[in-house]
């Protein structure tokens, strides 16, 4: 001990494990190198991983209310708009209503700066159902990287022919790109 400090010789320990900028040393039954994660990932504890931690994305979502909860839905463009506060990687998209349509499906298209971000009809909520998660046709995202400051708008392209549906919400799921 020298001046209140404990000196420990660790020469050759961590440097033999780490090979790349950003590497960390972790432990399972021995010291192991955990390679640096990808951009936008962060380190989390995970008891199912051999060394107890892994890199993952911090998932977040935007929920866009496209109507009130009690009025019938109506076909039209720009039913709701938001401006993204940061660059966003879209990994999933879904929609739900609190009152199901009858007679026809609900079809919804989402746009980034007036350009569709999904192929085909976009999101479908099947007639008599309240969620797109159970739809026979799931949406295919064609533009997953959404720019900071872009305007996200929702178009309602088809509604039920009996009950039109009520209380439409869109869920944009993904992570912030840093």
Locate predicted features.
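Extracellular repetitive beta-rich solenoid segments
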Residues: 1-178
